[in-house]
């Protein structure tokens, strides 16, 4: 009986989505810094967070190849995606902390640039967790 219960519990918890290591509620509040440039709109067109269109829609960003969603990205971000960059919580946090430095390191190109000038000094983990929660994706 104990063994059956352990198996059932293991299957239950392994089936649940695992979100980024951050605080979802804090991420929702911190996203206010992002919404001047970004929105969150589901694939079905549901507006989760009304925001700007200077940056790409961040719905489903975690798990997506960089530079591939419908948006005019900079050449270096597209090149990073073509080189295999797929957003997860860790590289998302590193990117939003210093987009230009991230791309320069990822591409090993000291001249790489990002169209995103804003640097998020803290709260990236929380924002990643929030984005994962509203997109139904895991990190």
Curated annotation (Swiss-Prot):
Signal peptide: 1-20
Binding site for heme c: 34, 37-38, 116
Modifications the protein undergoes after translation, according to the UniProt entry: Binds 1 heme c group covalently per subunit.
Key words, A-Z: Electron transport, Heme, Iron, Metal-binding, Signal, Transport
UniProt-listed InterPro entries: Cyt_c-like_dom, Cyt_c-like_dom_sf
Keyword Manganese carried by entry: no
Molecular function GO terms recorded: electron transfer activity; heme binding; metal ion binding
Family stated for the protein in its record: Belongs to the cytochrome c family.
Annotated protein name in UniProt: Cytochrome c-551
Organism of this sequence: Roseobacter denitrificans (strain ATCC 33942 / OCh 114) (Erythrobacter sp. (strain OCh 114))
Lineage, broadest ranks: Bacteria, Pseudomonadati, Pseudomonadota, Alphaproteobacteria, Rhodobacterales
């Amino acid at each position: 009986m104990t063994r059956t219960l352990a198996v059932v519990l293991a299957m239950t918890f392994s089936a649940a989505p695992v979100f980024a290591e951050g605080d979802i509620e804090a991420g929702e509040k911190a996203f206010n810094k992002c919404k001047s440039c970004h929105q969150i709109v589901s694939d079905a067109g549901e507006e989760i967070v009304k925001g700007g269109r200077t940056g790409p829609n961040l719905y489903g960003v975690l798990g997506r190849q960089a530079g591939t969603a419908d948006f005019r990205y900079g050449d270096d971000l597209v090149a990073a995606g073509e080189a295999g960059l797929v957003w997860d919580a860790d590289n998302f946090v590193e990117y939003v902390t210093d987009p230009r430095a991230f791309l320069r390191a990822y591409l090993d190109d000291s001249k790489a640039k990002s169209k995103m000038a804003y640097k998020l000094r803290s709260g990236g983990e929380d924002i990643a967790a929030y984005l994962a929660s509203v997109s139904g994706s895991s990190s």
